[in-house]
Every structure is written in C-alpha cells, then in structure tokens.
Amino acid sequence: MKLFSWNVNGLRAGLKKGTFMDFIQAEQPDILCLQETKAKPGQAEVDLPEYTEYWNSAERAGYSGTAIFSKVATDSYSQSFHDEIQSKSAWQDDSYGNPLNEGRLQIAEFPNFYLVNVYVPNSKPDLSRLQLREQVWDPALVSQLKLLEQSKPIVICGDFNAAHTEIDLARPKTNTHNAGFTKEERQGITNLINAGFIDTFRQFHPEEQRYTWWSHWAHSRENNVGWRIDYFFISNSLLPKLKSAEIHENFLGSDHCPVSIELEF
C-alpha cells in the first residue's frame, strides 16, 4: 500500500499547471493526503473516479484546508478532535481566525490503521501562533492519537510546519529563533516521538539532509536551501509493515514536495 502526503499550496493551481495530475499518473498512490488545498469541494475539478474524496476546507476562502483521496474503502471518517480533547483545550480566535475552523485535521479509519492527515498551524514570522502550537495544538494532537491508538495503530502525515533537528534544515544556526525551528516547535515533535510514534523517513535515512519545503526567495529550491517539515509518523506496532519512506523532490508545482511510505499487510 502506497501512501503519499503533499502540501500542494493550492490544488487549483496544481491542476491548472498540470503538475498534480502528472504526479498522480506517475505514482498512482493508494491513499493521498493533501494539505493547503485552498479550495472547497467542487472548486477544484479533480477527475479521479477511482478515488473517494474527503475534504476538510477552511471557513475562510482560499486558505488552508486538507483532503484525502483514497482507493481503499474507509470504515469511518471524521475531521475534528474528540469532544473530550477539544473541550480541555483553550481554543481561541486570533487575528487569523479560529484554528478549529481552518480545515487542519482529518481522521480516516481503515481496516488496519487510523490515518490522520494534519496541516499544523504555522507559528507565523512574529511567532504570534507559537503559543497555540505549544500549549494547545501539539498537546491536543498527541492526546487524540493516543486515544485512537487504543483501537488501532496510527499513521499520521502532513505538513507539521517545523523541522525537528539540525539536519532537517539547511541553515539551522540562523533559524534557531525563527518560526519552524524554535525550541517549542521542535519539542512538539519530540513529544510526538516520545509518545511512541516513529519518524518513518529517519528509519531508512538516519543521516540524510533532504528537504520537503523551500522558500520562494533567493532560488532556495535550486540551491537546495530547504527544510524537512513534512512527515509520516507511525505507531511502533506498524514498524514491521513499513517497507519504505521517501521524499520526492523531483515533483514540482508547489513550494513543498510529496513524501511517501509503503506499508505491506
């Protein structure tokens, strides 16, 4: 089973450029998770009859959003934190809106695992959303995963908007206090790993400096001055089923590239 995740930075743009369909035809994913779709169902005309589509779009037009395209039938689907977890967290509107209404979470149940697709809030250049990340979103996500894991193993993927360690970005020293590499954001990923979830790429590529996102500025992609902020994590119990984990830098059309894993059941 081939699972892919890709922050497409606007699905309509990818469809217009042809890069999205080129990717689908080349890789034929069994399950595809998208982030930053920036569209509601029907706004992006995707002609993929072999896939069932699940959309979680932001209330704000042209912003955020996630989607799952699956050839595999789901047992259940939801797009919110469990009520108990949601009620325990101090979700508040800010200048960007309410993070619960931004289409950032999808939970699809399959026969052998739960798949969680996330577009984690960016802390913003002024770090105005760092407190949301550290105190609300990251703890709620771990709680949600551990609750689901009581029933089935977890696959979680998406854009986490944070590089975990110094080998996960080209210029760690100059980004120590910048959004995406603050100690709080890095600790959030450490907490996820400490909760028992495995960074699949590092299982196969423990020392490789490869990236999934590049700034639009200063020819960053051409010079490979990037960040690894897109991940697949899995429950430890799925490790024997994990056959590969890859980054696909050759696919263009977004400031991110796709990442993938292969599971064999």
Model-derived features: where do they sit?
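N-terminal, active-site-proximal structural segment of metallo-dependent hydrolase catalytic domains
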Residues: 1-48, 52-54, 58-66
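Active-site beta-strand/loop signature of hydrolases that rely on acidic residues for catalysis
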Residues: 6-7, 24-42, 115, 144-166, ...
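Structured beta-strand-rich core segments of catalytic domains in phosphoester-bond hydrolases
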Residues: 38, 44-125
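Metal-dependent phosphoesterases centered on the DNase I-like endonuclease/exonuclease/phosphatase
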Residues: 52, 137-225, 229
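Short Gly/Pro-enriched turn/cap motifs at secondary-structure boundaries
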Residues: 56-59, 96-98, 221-224, 249-252
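Conserved beta strand-loop-helix elements of the APE1-like EEP
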Residues: 61-77, 220-240
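Active-site beta-strand termini and strand-to-loop segments that position acidic
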Residues: 71, 108-111, 235-236, 261-265
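Active-site-proximal loop/helix segment associated with metal-binding centers of metalloenzymes
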Residues: 114-131, 171-185
